Amino acid sequence: MGQTLFDKVWNRHVLYGKLGEPQLLYIDLHLIHEVTSPQAFEGLRLQNRKLRRPDLTFATLDHNVPTIDIFNIKDEIANKQITTLQKNAIDFGVHIFDMGSDEQGIVHMVGPETGLTQPGKTIVCGDSHTATHGAFGAIAFGIGTSEVEHVFATQTLWQTKPKNLKIDINGTLPTGVYAKDIILHLIKTYGVDFGTGYALEFTGETIKNLSMDGRMTICNMAIEGGAKYGIIQPDDITFEYVKGRPFADNFVKSVDKWRELYSDDDAIFDRVIELDVSTLEPQVTWGTNPEMGVNFSEPFPEISDINDQRAYDYMGLEPGQKAEDIDLGYVFLGSCTNARLSDLIEASHIVKGNKVHPNITAIVVPGSRTVKKEAEKLGLDTIFKNAGFEWREPGCSMCLGMNPDQVPEGVHCASTSNRNFEGRQGKGARTHLVSPAMAAAAAIHGKFVDVRKVVV
């Protein structure tokens, strides 16, 4: 019997254990940041343990960093977290992409950009959106702080192998419709728990035609569908992306092995979902989880349960309204879902020559220093600033209400991030998940519009 891509990578990393029971996996790459690592490092100190593989552990600063003045950290908690990671990196010999360095940025962007993320690896991070790296044909998943400490001490983790779910996506994406719309549509259609207990493998011609940026967007939000893992077969697009990256000096000797990473024709999946994107519309969420979304042309649904009622009450919306009726106040272009160069380029096409609507506060936060520098070389910062956007330093920013960048209470925000939970972007903030193009158009028009009619 053939094996799935996920099976192949998993089986190569099993050190001990039987199928159906917890198995001990070797971890190839451990990415850490300032929020979920301090307690784990302290655990090592208390037990007088060494960091098992400092050469496979890499740190960056992202969740709680300021995006206006990176060297004047006013928040005491943020300053403590940042300085603690800086000290831990020195004490334990960990390579850190520090504040102001050329590579610093959101952890799920730094890994791919530096070449640390590679096909066939097992990758963990104390962050729920670690599945992003699965776009390279890696098994990548988020872990808790106690597991972070376990990897620190042993470079292994006990995990139970999930079932395999194939999501076969075909058809040509219409103009103005993007990878973000694909994953939002899947979650809207099948729910926030359809992937629970599964590893999601995204396949099909649509996936093959996506850039690595688009593939990362889809895998990034696998967790929003309940899945711990999202994975895509590596191909020439993948290899070309990895080639020449600073930490990919093993490329020549590894690429032939990477070409063996695919699901066999006779591999058996536990479940298969098929999607034709030929008529897919731009997606907009109306509620308080990513499942609560609609096609742009559709009205918000009738109330079916208490969760819907609570969501409508929190969001200040009603059934039958449409996305264009939402009174927007903020637009956020950023996050590990959509703050890559291609996202900013797409948004800039819509913004160029226009002005941000007077009712809108709009900010752009490149996901990494690398993206920021590349965008500025292309003049994107000038385009956004001339239109009235704020152009910020890299970090997680307004994706989560942890750092200074927050949406005011009761204000609706068009956001390119991945979660629209209550309070996610700040106390009482009302988040609507959309593609970068939809967010950019909303900033200019002061409301959601059909981006298919304005994209160039």
Curated annotation (Swiss-Prot):
One GO BP: L-leucine biosynthetic process
Pathway(s) this gene product operates in, as recorded in its UniProt entry: Amino-acid biosynthesis; L-leucine biosynthesis; L-leucine from 3-methyl-2-oxobutanoate: step 2/4
Pfam families, per the entry: Aconitase
Record GO terms (molecular function): 3-isopropylmalate dehydratase activity; 4 iron, 4 sulfur cluster binding; metal ion binding
Keyword Lyase included in the entry's annotation: yes
Cofactor(s) named in the record: [4Fe-4S] cluster
Keywords assigned by UniProt, alphabetized: 4Fe-4S, Amino-acid biosynthesis, Branched-chain amino acid biosynthesis, Iron, Iron-sulfur, Leucine biosynthesis, Lyase, Metal-binding
Enzyme class: lyase
UniProt keyword DNA-binding present: no
Reaction catalysis annotation: (2R,3S)-3-isopropylmalate = (2S)-2-isopropylmalate
Positions contributing to [4Fe-4S] cluster binding: C336, C396, C399
E.C. no: 4.2.1.33
Cofactor comment: Binds 1 [4Fe-4S] cluster per subunit.
HAMAP family: LeuC_type1
Quaternary structure, from the entry: Heterodimer of LeuC and LeuD.
Family per record: Belongs to the aconitase/IPM isomerase family. LeuC type 1 subfamily.
Task performed by this protein: Catalyzes the isomerization between 2-isopropylmalate and 3-isopropylmalate, via the formation of 2-isopropylmaleate.
Protein name: 3-isopropylmalate dehydratase large subunit
